[in-house]
Amino acid sequence: MDEALNENASGSESDASSVASNLHDDEIIPWFFSREEIERNSPSRRDGIDLKTETRLRDSYCTFLEILGERLKVPQVTIATAIFFCHRFFLRQSHAKNDRQTIATVCMLLAGKVEETPVTLEDVIIASYERIHKKDLAGAQRKEVYDQQKELVLIGEELVLSTLNFDLCISHPYKPLVEAIKKYMVEDAKTQLAQFAWNFVNDCLRTTLCLQYQPHHIAAGAILLAAELPTVDLQSYREVLCQEFDITPCQLEDIRGQILELYERIPTSQESKVESSGGVAVVHQPISRDMASTEKCPSSDIEGGSSQVNLSQSDDHSVHDGSRSEGIGEVNSESEAQKNLQDHSVGNIMVEKSDDVGVVQLKKDLQLHQEEVESKQEKDKKSFEKDITKIDLMDEKDLTESEVEDEINKTMQTGRQIFMKVEDPDDNMTVEHSEIRNANNSGVDDELVADTCLINDSDL
């Protein structure tokens, strides 16, 4: 990783022996806690790292693992397992004492072994080093550099195994999700609902839900959230979900709410633009996390691509990269969270008339919206810089806030194209906006994370 890792090496060795001495081979470590317990008792909190900073660090290593997994060409289930290992590790170890990128590299190596998709130590080290040191891509080919990284990874592997007490058994929500959809959902709803539910499961890997709930509970929450799509009428299945997954309505709602929080915490990073054509307002706006949460319409599209779920498979290894195609999700502008959308989206601005007057009014409203977004981004930036000065674990080679947001925007499974409908209150006319496209198409270093899933018609 970087020079700071050399200082961590000796500390990691002592940490590993310390953890090992406090654990026994027959000791069973509980891996499920309440959200309050996780946030209050985090080891990072004792080292002065607040919840907001820890959340940023969690997003950082999740993004790192997704990109690393794509470079190594491992399936989604292996990436998910690596993220699980990282979450469990930092449940018991502090971010201040352990380099997250080294730990993430170790977790990817272990996940490949556990999921029987092994990758060589050399490949993992080189891919990880090139990801971290973008300006020194040839460095990993030098023997002295490679040997140093190898030593760090092997030390980290001992520490991770000791911290997890060699408990590497991981279950994912994918299998119960697919089985429930095949069992209960009507044919017309299978494809769309399964796609969105699968994407929600992938996205919630960035949360601590896997440390709070059983995999089948998370699957139930993802299905419930996907069932709120305007084109799917499955709310009557709420009781069925509770019975099938042995979950209470309160737990189901809590999972749904935490998934939505994931989309709400990251603001829009691009400004919106408005054009007019023939009296129709055309809005080009990147999809924000708030839009994803309130409109409930995320997808796995990256650069216009979509991912596929193979319903013909029922085990955790049924995940595969799907062919890329244009994916469009229709949004209901009267969703139950429409009020919150007004602070972050211009898509719901009512056009008084479908002529020049309406376009002018829309531009004025958009001007105010842009000023609010810019002001909020400036405050977030200052807050972030303040957090960085409080702790020294975010060094100059780590991702800045804007880079983290760019990476998350690429990897989050949110919808990239949406048709939005605006009703005219006077003439009862409907104006269909053109496609809303994500302005951040280029990405960083042309790195894209392969999506999993989408359903083939032949699988239904």
Curated annotation (Swiss-Prot):
Annotated stretches, region: Disordered: 1-20, 285-345
A Pfam short name: Cyclin_C
Which InterPro entries has this protein been placed in? Cyclin-like_dom, Cyclin-like_sf, Cyclin/Ssn8, Cyclin_C-dom, Cyclin_N
UniProt lists compositionally biased (Polar residues) regions at: 332-345
Molecular function (Gene Ontology), one example: cyclin-dependent protein serine/threonine kinase regulator activity
Could you list this entry's UniProt keywords, alphabetically sorted: Cell cycle, Cell division, Cyclin
* Superkingdom of the organism of origin: Eukaryota
Q: Where is the composition biased (Basic and acidic residues)?
A: 314-324
One GO BP on record is: regulation of transcription by RNA polymerase II
What protein family is recorded? Belongs to the cyclin family. Cyclin T subfamily.
Entry-linked PANTHER family:
CYCLIN (PTHR10026)
Name this polypeptide is given: Cyclin-T1-2
Organism of origin is Arabidopsis thaliana (Mouse-ear cress)
Gene name tied to this protein: CYCT1-2
